[in-house]
Amino acid sequence: MAICPELAQTDKSALANLSDETETLKNSTDEVQTSSSFSSSGGRQSSPLTSGSKLEREKQTPSLEQGDTQSELLDYKNYEKKLSKKWINYLKLKDSNFERHQPDTKLPTEITRVSDEELNALQSYCTMKINLIHRRGDSKKKTSSRHKKLHLGLDVEASERDAFSCTVPDELLNRIYFKNMRTTPKQEAAAKQHISYQCPYCNRKRAELALSAFLKQKKTLLESFLLQERIDEHLHTKDFLTRIGEAHQDFPRLSDDPRIIWKRLTEKSHIRYSGFERSETEQKLQRDGNSACHLPFSLPFLKRLTLIKPELVIVNDNV
């Protein structure tokens, strides 16, 4: 129930004024009663030995006091009636304000009028759930034999199946569905939205990622420059012509003597074939007892080729 704060303040002020007026009325009535009792007691306690003038005064004063008290009582009665009317008006106004500011509480009662079938189904479902919870608690508390435990477990499973297999009316499901549909937008609206460009953590992570991407880019650029320099250096120092020149350094010259050329070739062939270790294929062939040479060609044939090679070179040179 939502009541306006201004109305609440006015109610509080009116209530305070009425309470003050009632308090003053009580005090005044008490004073009148005490004064009337005091006057009556004073008149009774007067001694008979007083003078005549004093007696006359005493006779006159009670009549005056009685008249005053009667007028005061009439005034207080009128004031009391006015105060009671004020209280009645205040209570009526309060009831009217309460009824005026209570439309929301009546709406749910009108909306939540459901059918008897729906109420019965809901009640049966709740009772099943309560019984299931009680059975689970009892089964946990009991410490019996294995057979009893198995039996209780089967009973609990059967009761769970019965509880979950109970039919729920479509009206109840639809009502719950629409209620959830109404509450979800409210929850989404009330939820605090995360704005990435205002979040300091997101901005810090974004800066770190940008820095790492910048460093990777610069690193790849420098590596590409270094690789290009190495490729250029290799091409300039180890090009095709230099390779051909290095290969031609070992070749014999046209002005060399054929006997010197032959001597060099024989020395190279001896050094080359004497320093090699035997391969695995050669070892297998020797184990098998084969007498074939370890090379694909025999030594005499190789010598014959080496002998022929300088002649060919010489012939080409002569040509």
Curated annotation (Swiss-Prot):
Signal sequence segment: none
Ranges of Polar residues composition bias in the record: 25-34, 61-70
Residue ranges of the region described as Disordered: 21-70
Biased composition (Low complexity): 35-51
Domain of life: Eukaryota
Protein name per Swiss-Prot or TrEMBL: Uncharacterized protein C8orf48
